[in-house]
């Protein structure tokens, strides 16, 4: 769904109250071959078998911001293994209110890279849950991190997200959010839509920006793809912590991409 005001579809987005550290990892997919016209009987692009990925551009940016400690971490699997294994890009944002946020973020990135390549993308949510359980047992809820993990195989994209970090897609000049932030605000909105209380109360609740899911939680729920998402020529992906997406407007993010 387009996330900028000039799109034909309008949706609301409530920004978090505080901006965290700035970290963005941009995956720019610049395919050199021209697009072919789709035949009338061609399968839906989301489920169609993806073709090869001729050209892939990568870039990353990390900043400390106003914090004294960098609690964000990111990593990319070896590009030399792109054709054999695909590519994994991981971003973690350590939870600033927890003592071990930075450490857990770094260890989570390392863990994901050590597990890749995995045999079955559908098994990744369970791998993440197992890791989160280990983190919980070690830190007893006193440390945590968000997670965005994107896997590219040819033109197929799989992803798993935990917490309030973002995965954006820029396509034909429009910005789309591919994941849903796991914040208390979204749970409140669903309850408000059921008639429990006004939607305005959900958006102004003092705990609206609190995370409902994070690595380090005992019983974790991931936001993951079940079917691969097919990328198109000139698509661009952005893995971003809330330090970027809560500081910049969606139009600024789109223009920067």
Which residues does each PLM region occupy?
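PP2C/PPM-type serine/threonine phosphatase catalytic domain
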Residues: 2-257
């Amino acid at each position: 769904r387009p996330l900028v005001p000039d799109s034909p579809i309008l949706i609301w987005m409530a920004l978090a109250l505080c901006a965290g550290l700035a970290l963005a990892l941009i995956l720019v997919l610049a395919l050199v071959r021209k697009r072919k016209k789709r035949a009338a009987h061609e399968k839906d692009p989301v489920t169609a078998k993806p073709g090869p990925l001729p050209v892939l551009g990568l870039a990353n940016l990390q900043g400390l911001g106003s914090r004294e400690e960098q609690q964000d971490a990111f990593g990319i699997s070896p590009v030399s293994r792109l054709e054999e294994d695909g590519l994994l890009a991981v971003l973690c944002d350590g939870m600033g209110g927890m003592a071990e946020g930075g450490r857990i973020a770094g260890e989570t990135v390392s863990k994901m890279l050590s597990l890749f390549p995995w045999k079955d993308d559908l098994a990744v949510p369970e791998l993440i849950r197992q890791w989160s359980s280990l983190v919980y047992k070690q830190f007893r809820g006193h440390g945590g991190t968000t997670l965005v993990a994107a896997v590219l195989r040819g033109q197929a994209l799989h992803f798993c997200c935990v917490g309030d970090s973002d995965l954006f897609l820029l396509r034909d000049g429009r910005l789309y959010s591919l994941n849903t932030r796991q914040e208390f605000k979204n749970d409140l909105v669903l309850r408000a839509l059921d008639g429990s209380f006004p939607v305005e109360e959900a958006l102004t609740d003092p705990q609206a920006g609190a995370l409902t899911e994070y690595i380090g939680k005992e019983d974790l729920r991931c936001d993951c793809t079940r079917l691969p998402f097919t990328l198109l020529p000139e698509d661009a992906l952005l893995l971003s912590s809330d330090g970027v997406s809560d500081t910049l407007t969606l139009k600024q993010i789109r223009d920067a991409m």
